[in-house]
């Protein structure tokens, strides 16, 4: 689907994600539709109302509405579709710029911020945690994919995928990333990493990270970027993108959930994808 008048790369990606999710829903709910000009405004409104009924925030539904209007050349408004208005008081705690975010200079924490955005790690991994990241925390498989080994909340271990768009920046932060074969089980991965971490010496990647930085915002952005990345990978492999969990592809959500260290897809949708 192509729509004129989109000049922002981020807007393009957001609209594309909405189009993919809407198409998945349409295939299940209205299988007789084969071409775009068969789609009616009523069906688009039905989709938006369904998203709202599933508990998505006003922000998420507000994001979908202009995307469908642009793609399908509709002029749906919230009043017509009986959609809730977005309230300032209900905006999630992690906006792109919060008041306290303005009290620090991002340039002083450029590498830390890049790392957090690229990996979706919690604050404790950047600074202060038992397994605060070291150079040995980051590794690459034989396909060139980069991962970071993390032990965070509750002592849970995971290998989180580094977003492809940050790959070059991560390689600058850690110039000589170890290449290795992943182990067959998560338990073996955890054991190997903890031994490596214990014997690797005291050098950490970062020595400071102000609490004024809203790290949760970076995790939320990581979740959205990672989901989009997985959708694109699945499409590239000719896989079918489903809307089988609250408008999202369940398999892609599961991987995002693992990368975030939750392993609960409802948490991803309710706290990160909005």
What are these language model-derived features?
Residues 128-172:
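Conserved tyrosine-mediated DNA breakage-rejoining catalytic core shared by Y-recombinases
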Residues 1-86:
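N-terminal core-binding DNA-recognition domain of tyrosine recombinases/integrases
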Residues 163-231:
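Active-site/catalytic core of tyrosine-dependent DNA strand-transfer enzymes
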Residues 133-137, 262-268:
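Short, basic interhelical loop/turn and adjoining N-cap
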Residues 96-124, 247-250:
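Basic, Lys/Arg- and aromatic-enriched nucleic-acid-binding interface segment
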Residues 217-262:
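C-terminal catalytic core of tyrosine-transesterase DNA break-rejoin enzymes
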């Amino acid at each position: 689907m192509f729509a004129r008048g989109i000049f922002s790369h981020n807007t393009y990606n957001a609209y594309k994600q909405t189009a993919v999710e809407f198409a998945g829903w349409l295939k299940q709910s209205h299988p007789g539709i084969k071409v775009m000009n068969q789609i009616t405004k009523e069906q688009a409104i039905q989709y938006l109302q369904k998203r709202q009924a599933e508990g998505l925030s006003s922000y998420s539904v507000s994001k979908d509405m202009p995307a469908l209007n642009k793609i399908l050349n509709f002029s749906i408004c919230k009043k017509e579709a009986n959609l809730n208005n977005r309230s300032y008081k209900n905006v999630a705690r992690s906006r792109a710029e919060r008041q306290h975010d303005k009290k620090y200079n991002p340039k002083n924490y450029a590498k830390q911020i890049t790392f957090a955005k690229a990996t979706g790690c919690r604050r404790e991994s950047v600074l202060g945690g038992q397994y605060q990241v070291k150079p040995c925390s980051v590794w690459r498989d034989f396909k060139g994919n980069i991962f970071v080994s993390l032990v965070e909340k509750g002592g849970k271990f995971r290998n989180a995928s580094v977003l492809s768009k940050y790959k070059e920046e991560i390689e600058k932060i850690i110039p000589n990333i170890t290449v290795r074969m992943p182990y067959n089980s998560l338990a073996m991965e955890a054991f190997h990493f903890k031994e490596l971490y214990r014997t690797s010496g005291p050098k950490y990647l970062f020595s400071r990270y102000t609490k004024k930085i809203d790290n949760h915002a970076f995790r939320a952005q990581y979740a959205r970027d990672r989901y989009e990345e997985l959708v694109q990978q699945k499409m590239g492999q000719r896989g079918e993108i489903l809307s089988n969990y609250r408008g999202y592809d369940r398999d892609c959500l599961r991987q995002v959930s693992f990368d975030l260290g939750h392993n609960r897809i409802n948490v991803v949708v309710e706290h990160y994808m909005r």
